[in-house]
């Protein structure tokens, strides 16, 4: 009887180890899929992102012929003013950290705890790019964990300049308006290279709520925030 129990336990242990091994291999292949895309995009421009496709689907629920406006622009042809403005507004330590701004995360947690609700995120440009490229808007521990892994991959497989270049080309600036070139032409009828400091500051200020600010361009808060960004832009460190 004891031998039978022992054999049964041994079988269960082997089955458990086998299942665990299979799950590990599946997880490894899953992460490899992300890594392969990031490695490829280090030298090639992504045609679209998960976030862009989700936006297009929502737009086509109202208009089946809806299209996104985006025109890829190289890092060198994007105004340095816009680069500075976005870094100041979204991730002041972008050139210094490894993808995670731990001080910023701590401050965001303290601010949220004080307010009793989520009022600050603390996400870096690399983290935002990870979400935009691959992930849905779902909020879960699994998604946050996957975001962290993808962020780490971005930082390992790309340099900071490439991360910022992709971010500036896939960021949303209005309903169906993606990337610096489309945003510059949509709001100011200039190229991304031709944006001045004031225009760049205003575009950067729109990033947290682009759909809202596209409809409310005279927002007093948007104006004040733009002025704050403009004043801080000289301190931005470009990669």
Q: Language-model segments: which ranges?
A:
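Juxtamembrane regions of bacterial inner-membrane/periplasmic proteins
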Residues: 2-239
């Amino acid at each position: 009887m004891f031998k039978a129990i022992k054999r049964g336990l041994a079988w269960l242990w082997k089955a458990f180890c086998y299942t665990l091994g299979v799950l590990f291999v599946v997880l490894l292949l899953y992460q490899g899929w992300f890594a392969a895309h990031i490695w490829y995009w280090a030298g090639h421009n992504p045609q679209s992102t998960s976030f862009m496709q989700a936006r297009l689907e929502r737009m086509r629920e109202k208009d089946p012929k809806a299209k996104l406006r985006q025109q890829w622009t190289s890092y060198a042809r994007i105004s340095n003013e816009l680069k500075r403005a976005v870094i100041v507004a979204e991730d002041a330590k972008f050139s210094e950290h490894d993808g995670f701004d731990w001080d910023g995360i701590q401050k965001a947690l303290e601010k949220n705890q004080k307010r009793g609700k989520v009022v600050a995120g603390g996400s870096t440009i690399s983290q935002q790019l990870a979400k935009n490229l691959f992930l849905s808007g779902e909020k879960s521990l699994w998604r946050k964990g996957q975001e962290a892994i993808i962020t780490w991959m971005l930082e390992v497989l790309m340099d900071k300049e490439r991360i910022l270049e992709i971010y500036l080309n896939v960021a949303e600036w209005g309903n169906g308006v993606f990337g610096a070139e489309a945003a510059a032409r949509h709001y100011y009828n200039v190229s991304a290279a031709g944006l001045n400091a004031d225009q760049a500051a205003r575009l950067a200020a729109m990033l947290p709520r682009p759909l809202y600010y596209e409809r409310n361009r005279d927002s007093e808060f948007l104006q004040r925030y733009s002025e704050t960004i403009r004043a801080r832009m000289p301190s931005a460190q470009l990669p």
